[in-house]
Amino acid sequence: MKVNSILCSVPVETPGGKLRRKRSEGPSPIMPKIAITSLNHWTLKNGFKQCKFYDIDMLYPEDKDIAKFFSENDADIVGLSAVVSTSYLQVKRISKIIKEINPKALIVCGGYLTAAADTVLRKTDVDVCVVGDGEIAWTGLLAYASNAQRSNTKVRSEEL
């Protein structure tokens, strides 16, 4: 059985904050996130072809647009790339939207925010935090979920 996964970039700005018109210019430009795009490539390279990339950071969609995306794209596992600690409120907001749409989705958070993994796991809807490089952990989670589907068992974060 195929595992449907979605990797998402997470904005660093506070939710609801006013964005600059040209976010990619100026002294602190918003740049494409290399780690999450590399992880997406690694996922596809390792045979998990059902992986989509949702660039929330660059698109900066409203809550209703995020909800629409996840209602149209049923995911077994969602990866959130939180590159800085200021992403916390965004992770909290986005993970809540995902769980409201798809309560069975396993939400995985990676990036520097996971230095505070205990807080992220207690205060958000994130199920798993990956600390450090995520390529091996992410494909391991996808393999685990794929095996769980084949054996008709539930993916449980405490077993990982």
Language-model regions, residue ranges each:
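N-terminal start-of-domain structural block
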Residues: M1-K2, D127
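Aromatic- and Gly/Pro-rich amphipathic surface segment
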Residues: P27, P32-K33, T37
